[in-house]
Amino acid sequence: MKNRILLCVIVAAGLFSSCDREPVSAVPEGMTLVWSDEFDRDGAPDPEKWVYSTGGNGWGNGELQFYTDKRENSIVKDGKLILTAQSENGLWTSARLKTQHKGDWTYGFFEIRAKVPRGRGTWPAIWMLPTFMKYGNWPRSGEIDIMEHVGFEPDIIHTSVHTNAYNHKIGTHKTAHDTVRGATKKFQTYAMEWDPDYIQWYINGEPFYRFDNPHISNAEWPFDIPFYLILNLAIGGTWGGQQGIDEKMEKAEMIVDYVRVYQKN
């Protein structure tokens, strides 16, 4: 695990200090680290932890990119995972990684430190889908969006859940957004606590949205089955492309410092 250093620059007079502090973690008491990737080995993403999703079928959202398993689109370098979307002769390629069958969890605390790209038309996301569609295909078995960002709103971070009762297709999805100054310029910590009774989201250690289990049926709450993590960088699409794609943009990067999963002891 990375050892993070609190770097403080002390002015000679001793009257002023400038400290670059990592945001406070919101890991609840009684949780133990059960899975992580600190990206401390250069090269391709760890095949023991990540699986590539490849293809260019629009992914249900009219996205423009073709997801590949090339190192040009996903590589670990200098302690970071870099997902790169790039235009090649007018066609976009990018990367989508998942932990399905490598890391699947029911309940826990999920923490990811990442920096999202700047550029109109980008659509990065950190999210979760069910390992098995126990209650039926999307959205019946659920979706949890830990973080979504669209390039035409550079300082806004979105989160949501989708179920059969609550989803964007019928305009009922449970969603929230928050202003995060500098989301595209420096790393932020995105986290989600998933409990049998609620899902709570955090940004930089601060809670900002909560969805409570209504205890009615799996149409409202299908979140009692294993889910896996997804990291992806899309281009365009029904949401990311709402205001077009920057014609001058040839490349965009989503950079991930770490991914950590905790569960109760």
Regions found by a protein language model. Name each.
Residues 19-265:
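GH16 jelly-roll
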